UniProtKB/Swiss-Prot annotation:
ATP binds at residues 130-138, 153. One of its GO terms (biological process) is regulation of ubiquinone biosynthetic process. Is probably a protein kinase regulator of UbiI activity which is involved in aerobic coenzyme Q (ubiquinone) biosynthesis. One of its GO terms (molecular function) is protein kinase activity. Its EC number is 2.7.-.-. InterPro entries: ABC1_dom, Kinase-like_dom_sf, UbiB, UbiB_bact, UbiB_kinase. The keyword Transmembrane helix applies. It comes from Shigella sonnei (strain Ss046). It is a multi-pass membrane protein. Pfam families: ABC1. This is Probable protein kinase UbiB. Keywords: ATP-binding, Cell inner membrane, Cell membrane, Kinase, Membrane, Nucleotide-binding, Transferase, Transmembrane, Transmembrane helix, Ubiquinone biosynthesis. It is found in: Cell inner membrane. Belongs to the ABC1 family. UbiB subfamily.
Length: 546
């Protein structure tokens, strides 16, 4: 470690201790050497004994700065790892930091645009930022080319070295978690940090966010439910993004929405419909749909439309994940826990040797009490959370795409019930899920699959006769070679009849291995094993002739 890293690590540990976070470690895990090390190097009493543990953890992360704040925000969505009182406190972390100098932002924009002054591209550039966060800040302007109002998002200067330095230390601390916490291995701390690192590095590339926004805008073009502001790709780079400026009501401002005459029931239902449309129709969903990124258009309040911004984090599901997820929801609400258990095994989410009966019983034990509530009050997000927590006890591997989905679903539910407390998520989502599943089977699904594969088949059709001819010729050559060797073996008078069997098998295996080695290199070690087996059989046959 460099001296700078040592100083930073020392500050991190002292901060944790000043908030009494060593209480997280069971006393039996604090050995005498560790206790001596703690008091000799880090003498720091708990200065916040009047606060609960979750609040102390939140305040400590807030004090450590942007990288740790965003880490805490990500951890707040992993409710499979933390009890509710800690996850709820982490969710309160605010990604708000002091803005950097607007003149510096202007210099970055000019560098990204080839060194020309800002005035060559934009009018009315506002030096004071509209908003500021740990990764980037936003300025307003007008495009010189068409006069449209835009926002310019600029990455903070020199943020990457800071992020990499703190991530390196977070990895170091993560490796200590399994040694200090009794449940440390189950938490898989290194995997959690790796997931966070990927998300954070992705957020630093505004070209990626631009592409995500363009894709979402295309998916919901002319939709009455969701509007994504236009991105101007000619002005975008890794460190800068330019998009249409929007005016809307923050989705969390219920009073203003009601004052504007918004149809709150329809707005809440559309939030659920937008989410399931993204997941099941498009396989591409906005995975950062917290209230700060969602607005509602002022226009047509009786037919309200969402406006989505900040598309830096997105998720996607493959066709199998979507099918298993939809069937899991339907099986759960039908209380078919056997089906839920089998779906987890079939999908590969849990090992194939999982005892289905035990798994079914565990799911029933955890999920059956949920139905004590009225159906309208059941949370999809918590259903998924309960299923994941139960499956984790049966060695379910972390599924990053499902974690993102569960986090987003909790956001959607929270917003929907804030807008319209009587929102019945199951009633809203069930027709969509049943329709989607029905669409995946039967003749329509076969026709669609044929249409999807037809271009590939048409492209390969001219090559088909040659491929068939080559396969037949190679097979004929192999058979001819085997027959020839068999005839030669039969012409020899060996003293033991079994030698022919071994020699023939040996020759066949060697030739087969040679053929596969040349024509099918992707088969890996298989040709080698065949040739080795052939040589052994040949040797046994030769020995029998002695």
């Amino acid at each position: 470690m460099t001296p700078g890293e040592v100083r930073r690590l020392y500050f991190i540990i002292r901060t944790f201790l000043s908030y009494g976070l060593d209480e997280l470690i069971p006393k039996m895990r604090i050995t005498l050497p560790l206790r001596l090390w703690r008091y000799s190097l880090f003498w720091m009493p708990n200065r916040h004994k009047d606060k609960l543990l979750g609040e102390r953890l939140r305040l400590a992360l807030q004090e450590l700065g942007p990288v740790w704040i965003k880490f805490g925000q990500m951890l707040s969505t992993r409710r499979d790892l933390f009890p509710p009182h800690i996850a709820d406190q982490l969710a309160l972390l605010q990604d708000k930091v002091a803005p950097f100098d607007g003149k510096l932002a202007k210099q970055q924009i000019e560098a990204a645009m080839g060194g020309l002054p800002v005035e060559a591209w934009f009018d009315d550039f506002e030096i004071k930022p509209l908003a500021s966060a740990s990764i980037a800040q936003v300025h307003t302007a007008r495009l010189k080319s068409n006069g449209k109002e835009v926002v310019i998002k600029v990455i903070r200067p020199d943020i990457l070295p800071v992020i990499k330095a703190d991530l390196k230390l977070i990895y170091r601390l993560a490796r200590w978690v399994p040694r200090l916490l009794p449940d440390g291995r189950r938490l898989r701390p290194t995997e959690v940090v790796r997931e966070y690192e990927k998300t954070l590095i992705d957020e630093l590339n505004l070209l990626r966010e631009s592409a995500n926004a363009i894709q979402l805008r295309r998916n919901f073009e002319d939709s009455p439910m969701l509007y994504i502001p236009e991105v101007y790709p000619d002005y975008c780079s890794e460190g800068m993004m330019v998009m249409e400026r929007i005016y809307g009501i923050p989705v969390s401002d219920v009073a203003t929405l009601e004052k504007n005459g918004t149809n709150m029931k329809l707005l809440a239902e559309r939030g659920v419909q937008v989410f399931f449309t993204q997941v099941f129709r498009d396989s591409f969903f906005h995975a950062d749909m917290h209230p700060g990124n969602i607005f509602v258009s002022y226009e047509h309040p009786e037919n309200p439309k969402y406006i989505g911004i900040d598309c830096g984090i997105v998720g996607s599901l493959n066709k199998e994940d979507k099918r298993y997820l939809a069937e899991n929801f339907i099986a759960f609400f039908n209380r078919d826990y056997r089906k839920v258990a089998e779906l987890h095994v079939d999908s590969g989410w849990v090992p194939p040797d999982t005892n289905v009966e035990e798994f079914e019983f565990a799911i029933r034990t955890v999920c059956e009490p949920i139905f004590e509530k009225p159906l309208a009050e059941i949370s999809f997000g918590h259903v998924l959370l309960n299923l994941f927590n139960t499956a984790r006890r049966f060695n379910m591997e972390v599924q990053p795409q499902l974690v993102l989905l569960q986090k987003t679903l909790l956001y959607v539910e929270g917003v929907g019930r804030q807008l319209y407390p009587q929102l019945d998520l199951w009633k809203t989502a069930k027709p969509f899920l049943e329709s989607w599943i029905k669409d995946q089977v039967g003749i329509p699904a076969l026709v669609r699959a044929f249409k999807e594969k037809a271009p590939f088949w048409v492209e390969k059709m001219p090559e088909l006769p040659e491929l068939v001819y080559d396969s037949l010729r190679q097979g004929k050559y192999l058979q001819h070679s085997v027959d020839k060797i068999a005839r030669e073996l039969q012409s020899n008078h060996v003293r033991q009849g079994q030698s022919r069997y071994f020699l023939g098998i040996g020759a066949t295996l060697v030739l087969s291995g040679t053929f596969l080695l040349v024509s099918r290199p992707e088969w890996g070690l298989m040709p080698g094993w065949l040739m080795a087996g052939g040589l052994i059989a040949w040797f046994v046959g030769w020995r029998k002739t002695r």
